Each structure stands twice: as structure tokens, then as C-alpha cells.
Amino acid sequence: MKKNQTMQGTFSKLFGKKHAHPSTTSLYATNPPWIFTHEAQEEGTRDFDGIYYGDNRFNTVSESGTATLKARPRVRPLLTFIPLNAQENHGLAVPTPSVPEDFADKEVGGTSTLVNGNLRLYSSVGDLRPACYDLDSSIPPPPPGPAPGPPQDISQPPGESPPPPPPSVPPPPPPPLLVEPPPPPSTAPPPPPPLDILSPPSTPTPPDFIPPAPPSAFLSPPPPSLPAPGPPAPVSLHTPGTHLFPPGAITKWKSEVALNGRHPEDPRTSPPKSPAELKRSPLGPSPEPHLTFPRSPKVPPPTPVRTSSIPVQEAPGASPEEEEATQKTSAPSPLPPSFNIRPASQIYPDRALEPEQPREPRPETPGSPRLRQSEPQTNGQAGAPPPAPPLPPPAPPLPPPAPSLPPAAPPLPSTELAAPPSSGFMKTSKSNSPALKPKPKPPSVEDTASSEPVDWRDPRQMEKLRSELSAYLCGTRKEDRSLSHRPGPTVALKDKENNKGTSLSEEAAPPSLPEKVHPCIPEKSPSSSSLPEREATSSLVLPPVDYIAQDTPAPSVRQIRSELEARFASSAEKEAKPSLASLPPKPRLEGGRTFENGTDNGRFHKPATKNPPQPSTTPLPTTILQPKVVPGPATSPKVTPGPATPFKPTPGQAILPKATPGLTLPLKPTPEQTTSPKNTPGKATPLKDTPGQATTPKDTPGQDTPPKDTPGQAAVLKNAPELSTPSSQLMAEKDLASVRQREKPETQEDPVATQLSTNGTLSPPALPPKMSTSGEEAPFLYRPHRSQNSHSRGVAVVTPTRARGEAPDSGDVVDEKELQNHPAKSLTPGQPADQLLRHPVTGEVVERGSPMALLLAARQRAQKTRTGGTAIGRSSLPGSLRDHSNQPEASSDSIFYRGSRPNSFIVVPKVPSETEDSHLTSARPTGPSHWKPQQGPDTQGSEPTYRHGWTKAETPAPVARERPAPSSLPQSRALPKSFSSPPSPSYKREEEEEEFSFDIIPPPPEFSNDPEPPAPGQQHQGRRGSPPRNNFSDLGQSWGPNPTPGFSRFRGTQYPESGGLDRFSGSGRSLIKKRLYVGESHRNPGMPRGSTGRSLSSPNCFGPQPGGPEMRRVNSAGRAAPGGLHARRLSLEGARGATEVKFKAPGGGGGSSSKAGDYGFVPAKGSRSPHGNTHYGSPINTFTVRPGTRHPISYAYPGTHRKATS
């Protein structure tokens, strides 16, 4: 029957064969009689029914059950079946519809069903949510709030409503608050209502939520996250936060949260959990028993609810206005999962109430790492709910902040918190994600809390901040947040930049240091600073919390803090100056460092808010969130108003204010400027900073973090795509996170935690963990993501160079430098954040959330992942590379890698970002001069030349990287954003000339990860058909014109590289494999260079691209001696003429071939001569290996090269 149905179904239905008869008759009362008749005939018994009835009705009655089954199969066939009537009858199983209707009714009205349906409906059906949700929530009905609240919270769609919070307010404070709730109300008297609503709601919600989630698990885990949302819930965070989040997050997160394993927070949540659970039971069930109970089971549905419901839910309860705003914003927010953030939103209200509260909780929680953690989560927004949907949530957090913002407007604090929470949320997400992280944070939190409590803990301060924020956020933030949402990211970046600038200018250095320390925990490094920062952060509201999350990573926090403190002590002063003064050349090193400092600062300028180290992260989020939330004004308002106020508390800490101004200013700066401003704000140095910092952070993390970077980046990318707008912001945030992380990289663990928090939050928790793994890398990940793969790569690449080279250069700042590298990296992330994704074809900046953006982000992620591999190689490499970094520092990352590690060297594949980074690295290492030129040349136009010289002088590879970097950087990393900075045709052309290889051949499909590179690559392929020769020229130029400078570096590097190349040749396969994975990553990101270079240079293991930066890198490495190289090229060319030609052909560019040839040639050089051949054979083999890894390489080059080589 079914077979008939299915196969014959269409005909059966058409002809009314038995196929549909029983079902039709039974389920579909209105099957056409003819159909039924036919069906009846065929069906026999059923047929009988059908016939008997003639209509299907009889059958329906008789064969309800059967009919139902049939109905489903039939629905499909019916759907296929054209007749609408029949289809309707058949397809629409009346019974099924009935059931759904019942469900809908029950869902909406019923308890269990409602819960299931309700949540689901709420979630899926916005309809329910508004109608049922708002109303159903009992939000209206249970104005009391307690009853409605919990259920609603639990219900999330319905429960999200603050109503539950209010009811829960009373209870939540005790349970959730644990310590904070009261303060929240107290602290946020004005917001108290919201706070109460939020906070208490948090608690109630957690209870409500908890039951739904896994009441316990969810509450615990999600609640922590959720609590994060609830500032008040800081302590109670879980509970309140959970509640807050639970409404939104819980819905989705119930299961997810449970899964997320907020369990770590569970303990924290535990107490709340009980109350929450109890409450939930009584409250939830009472207000919406169906919702509450179903909630638990209905955890999945809540997910959708989370999106729309959460905002609504909270909106109603907490501040009608705020919650509503949240709801509106939240609900509107595209990312429902993100809208776990709704909880963030909720948190915002909470925050609004508790903007300071969270901070306060922090103070209170100081002793309570968990609380603090909780709080961070609360603030961070366990908003972390994003943990489960980390990415989505992160995005939502941003939006939620916006939503929150509107609502927060009234309770500015909320917004403030909200924005930060958003950030925090992201971070928290991370936190949540890494529930552990939060814990690590605790120490930080404690420290921070202890220190931080000072200022913002003051209810008075809170109130003031709130008022201010209210004023700012009210108008600006609401608007900006919404409007700026998208801009937000940029703004965030800008803010950051500005922060950076401001920070830089202001206490930038010290705060920066604190920030750096902050990674440990602001207060860690400079307790005072930290504290103020924390306070500032507190002021920032979320940022501190966020930062806590980030601080969480402060596992090493204390340790790092000490370190950082020491470092920062000297570095702060030193760095502060370099940051400001060193900008140019020095900043390269120092600038880098400075920028590191600046980055610290700058990085932290980015996080000006971030400045308070925690704020750093938080600011980042804050900034980001703020920007996002308070896009332009928001940023200002958020940072300025919120932070301003908070900063006020922090005023002591210029940083926060700095952040505020910085944020504000940066906000103004264009996103591009963000990159630039980041740099620019940093000062001229910032530029450097951006590149340098990007480089530096990249560098540092690069070593460690690069791999992580990749994951992080992936996460970020994910986030970016998911967040789209948030992406920008997230990116920025991530960048910040990255920056923070970068800062933290010092505390790699910390950074990891932090990054996890920051990035993790932004990234999926998983990523955060990844990040966690490589604290530093995580940031890089972000940055790479943000920046582009380039960044990731750049990070990796730059890290060694910068960290090693630069750090060494800046002897005293070396440590700092590294620290700063992280900050720099941080900046870079900002930069990346700043760096918008650019359409590979159009070159247009892609909207964060757009599909293209997602694709690009994915590509970046992939590249980064590869880069991650590469980065990892690099990471490991970095040690050696770093050591080598000094030597090859100018040379190029790739060289470093090659020199230090042939395998790693691949990592170098400079993505545009990498190029940037390299550029930065190179530029920085090269010296201020280059750096400056880079700045000057930053402009694409000039840069190429500059770069050209640079490349040659400094190192083609880095230049390749850097070139795009400067161009990108100044340009706001537009190019880098493009992933293949080179992708830009103009850019590429310039690059071509400078480093033809890398752009010449579009990456094979495998490389296609770099969307841009392929297009540009292909373009360039044709274009580079001749350019490749240019590449040769380029190389030749490097050899001939700038052999000494470039090659000198290369020589130093090259010689090692020679060894490296040989090594590469020898271990070509390993390298290739690595490169395939990593290199490919590079190829994708650095496709122009890596892909083209590698593809073209594949024969050479795609190590050094003859013409491309990569070639330069590898080639340069290979061509230790310019003359020798040249000669080698010639000989190799002769020997490999066919190969080259072939290569060219396969490469798609004579130049490419040349390059490839060159590349191959490189191996052919002197000692490589044999290698050249061998390399050719081997590289080809390697390529073969590569092909195994990636066919493109193998098919593209192996055959040709091998043949030619052979």
C-alpha cells in the first residue's frame, strides 16, 4: 500500500487508487470520491471503506489510525499529487491538522502541550510568542511576575518575560542573588525594578528556567550563563542570570545549556537552582505550569523561543520598556539562537538595573569567583547561552544589547551592562561555554571583584552611570544600537581603536598594561589599575564582567597578573610611551610593543573599555557591544555613557575614560579607520599598531595561538557569519577578545580562558575551549577570523617575527612586546574586526550577516583552520621561529617558519592579512622605517611600492603579507578583510609585482577557501600570466635590485631557509602535508601567495613561491643568495624550463610558472641545485603528497612539475 502510495501514490491519488484511499478516506475526509473509489477498489478492505463511504469520511472513521499513517505518506505523494482538493484532503491530514490545532490550542493554552507547543510555537511561531508569549507568559496575567515570571522564564517565550523576574525578584535575590541580587536592586535602585525583575527574574527565571533546562543542569549551566545576563544575578548570577537567560537562552539552552554543561556553573547555579527549581516548580507551574514543565521537556522548543521569546519575555517583566525593547530588539534580532542573548538582553535589563550591580556582584563576588564568574556570566550573559549556540548567541548578544539598549535606555545601566553583557555575553558565552572558564575567571573575578568593587560597586556610581547611560543610551544607544548594530562592530572596532588611541594617549600604557595584565585580570597586573579598570570595567558594566569572563582565563591570571604587572609596570610606562611615541618605527617594535602597549592600550584602545583589562575584554565587547549596542553614540554612550560613567568610577583609571573617549572617538573612526584608527587612534603607531599590532598579536598568538587562532577564527567566523552584524562587532569583539587574548597571550592560559570567554563567547563554546587550549591562539583565531585568515596567519607569522624579532628588537620590551604582541594581536583582532569581509569579486565590504559574509567568514575560518594547522606548525615553530624570528623577523614569517620550521614556514602563507601581519612584522621588524613606509604605503598605491622595496628589502614574503597589511591596515584592512588582500586586483597587481606568485594562480578548489584569492588569483592568473614573470622580476628584483635588502634578510633567513627549504624539500612532504593542511589554509587565506605561490610553487612544495610572497618567503628562503638564487633560478629554469613552462601553464601564469620555476629553482640553487631537481622531484612528490592532501596541488602541479622536474 505504501509502496503504491509512494510509487504509485501520485497516480493512485490521481486515479484515486487504494494508495490514498484509506488514508484519503480516513484522514482526508474530503478525498474526491473518485479517488476514494479507485482507492477503495484497489485497497480492498479499506477500499471498501472508501467505496462504502464514497467520501472518505467513513473511511476516516473506520481507518483513523491507518488513515493517519497513510495520511503522512500520502501527504508526500499528495503534495506531489497536483489536485489541490485531493492534496488538501490527502496531503492535509485532517487528523494531523487537528492534532496540531489541538496542540496549538493546548500549547498556547494547555500546560504541557502549551509548553511544548507554546515554547515551540512561541519559538517557531512568533505568533504564539506575541499572543501567547506576551500574554501567555502570564507576563500580563501574572503581573505579580513571580508566577508568570518563572513559568515564562521557563517558558522562555512566555517565561522570558520579566514578569517572572519580578516575581522572582523577591525570591531571586536571595537565591540567585546569593549576594548580589540585593545589591542589584540596591545598586540599581532605578533599575531595581528591572533589576529586580531581571535579577529576581533571573533567579526565578533560573528556577523556572532551570526546571525547563534541566532545571538543575540547565539552570546551573545555563543559569550561569543566564545569570551572566543578570547582573544582579552576578552572584545569583546563575539563578538570576540563568533566569534571565533562561528565558531567552534557556529556551534554546535548556537542553543546550544543559548540554553546554553549564554544570560548572551548576554549582553556582545550584543554590539558585534549588530556588529556581522550587520556584520554577511552584512559580513556573503556577504561572505556566504547562510552560514550566513542558519547558523542561520542551527544552528544544525553547531554543526558538529564546530568540523571540526571550526578548519579549524579559521585556514584559523587567522593564516593560526595557524588556520590551529587548524583546523587540531581541525578537527582531535575526539571531534567535543568539538571542540566547536575549537573556543577554534580559541581562541587560538586569544589567541595566545591575549594570553596576553585576560589577557590584563582582565586588561582592570578588570573594566568590563563582559568583563573579556567575556574574561575568550573568554579565557576560551567560548570555552565554550562546554557549550552546555560542555563535548565534554571540551575535544576538550584540543585537540583544541593541535590544537591550533600547530597553536599557531607560535603565542605561542595563544598556551599559547590556552592551557589555553582550560582550560579556560573548565572553560569557565563552565563559559559559567553557563553564570552566568562568571559573578561571573567578580568580580574576575575585581579584577584579575585590578591586573593582571600589567604584562601580557604588550604587551611587551605578546609578549615576545608569543615569548617564540612560541618557546616552536612551537616545543614542537605542538608536545606535539598533542602527549601529551592524555598524556596531565597526564602531566597536573604532571604539576600540579610539579606546586604543585614547587609552594609548591616556593611561593607555598603564591601563594598557593593566589591560594586559587585565588579561590576567586588570586588577591583577595593576591591582589598582586593574581595579580601576575593573571598576571602569564595572562602570563599563559588562566589560568588567565580560572581562572577568575573559579574565576567567586568568587562570594564569594571577600569575600573569604578576608577570604582567611587572611587565606592565615597566612596560606600562615604557609601552605607554612607545605606544604614543614609538608609534612609527619604534612602535614597530616598540610601536608594536607600544602598540602592544598601545595595543594594550590600543588593543585596549580598542577596548578602551577593554582598557580596564577586563573591560578590555569587556570593553571590547562593550565596545563592540557598545558599538554594536551603541554603534556610534552607543559606543560613546555605552562606553562613554556607560563606560563614561563607569569610567567615571574608573576615571581614576584614565583607561576607562580613555576607553570612553577612545571608544567614542574610535567609534567615530571608521571601521576602516578602526583598522587604521585602531592603528591611527593608536596614533601613527596604531597604524603600525594595526599592522604591527595585528602582527604582534598575531605574532604572539601566532606562535601559540595561530592554530587556535584558526579555531578561534573559525569560531569568530562562525560568529561573524552568524552574527553578521555581530560578526562585525563580534569580530571587533573577538578582535578585542583576541586582543585581550593577545594581551592575555602572555597569560596564554589566561588568554585562552579569556579568549574562550571573549572569543569563546563569541565563538562557540567549543571554539572557546579550543581557544582555551591555546589561549593565545584563540585570540588569533579571532583575529584571523576578524582580520582575515591573513590575520590568523599574520598572527602566526607575525608572532614569531614580531614577538621574536620585534620583541628582541625592543630588548626591554621583548617580553612586553610579546605581551604586547598579544595586545597587538588584540589590536589586530580589532583590526580584523575592523577589517570587514570584502566580497572577493566585487570587493565590496560584505555585510556581516549576509550570506557572502558568512561564506567569507567560513572561508576565513577554513583558512584559519588551515592556518591553524599552519599556525600550529607555526606555533611550534614560533618557538624556533621566534628564536629565528629575530633573524628572519624582517625576512618574513614564512621564512621564519621555513627557517625555523620548514613545516611551519608554510604557515607563513601570507594571507593578505598575513601579508599585513608580515608586513607589520616585517615592517616592524624591518624597522620603523619600513613600518613608516608601510604606513605611508599603507595606502594601497604607495604601499605596493613601499612594499615592493620592502618586500625586497625586508622580505618579499612579509611584504606580501605586509603589503596588503599596510594597505589594508590603513585602509581599514579592507583588503585584508578581503582575506586576500592581494585579491584586490589593484592590490594584487601591486602585489603581483611585488609578489606575483601568491596571487598568480588562483588556489585550486582546495584553496578556494579563499574565495577572493581564487577570483583574484584567477584574474591574476591571466593577468599574471605575464606578471608571473614579473614575479620573477619581483624575485629578480628582490635578488637583483633588492637582493641585499630583501635577500639579505632572506639570506639570513634564506640561509636558514635554505636549510629550511632543504628541510622543506627534505621534509617537503611533511611540510607539504603540513602546508597542505596548514599551507593550504594559508593558501586559502594567503591563496594569492600561498595558493598561487604554492600552487605555482607547488613543485617547490608550494613553500616559496617564486614570485609571490610565499615564493619570496620560501623562495627567498630557498634563494638564500640572491645571486645564487637568481642563478639557481636560471639553472633551474633551464633545467626546469619545461617544468616552469608547464608550471606556468598549470599555474595559469607564465609568471606563476616562473615563480614556480623560481621556486623550484630556489631549491635548485646551490645546494638546492640538486634539491631543485630533487626538490622538484620531491616537491613534486610533496606536491603529490599535497595532492593527496589537496588534489589541486597534486593535480595542478605534481604532474606538470614532476614531469618537468623529472
Swiss-Prot record:
Protein name, as recorded: Uncharacterized protein C6orf132 homolog
Residues bearing PTM Omega-N-methylarginine: 1051, 1083, 1094
Region named Disordered: 133-547, 568-837, 859-1206
Composition-biased stretches (Low complexity): 305-319, 414-436, 522-531, 656-671
Biased composition (Basic and acidic residues): 351-363, 454-467, 568-577, 732-747
Modified positions (Phosphoserine) in chain numbering: 255
Species of the source: Mus musculus
Polar residues bias locations: 1028-1041, 1170-1184
Superkingdom per UniProt: Eukaryota
Sorted UniProt keywords: Methylation, Phosphoprotein
Composition-biased stretches (Pro residues): 139-151, 159-234, 384-413, 1001-1016
Residues found modified as Phosphothreonine: 680
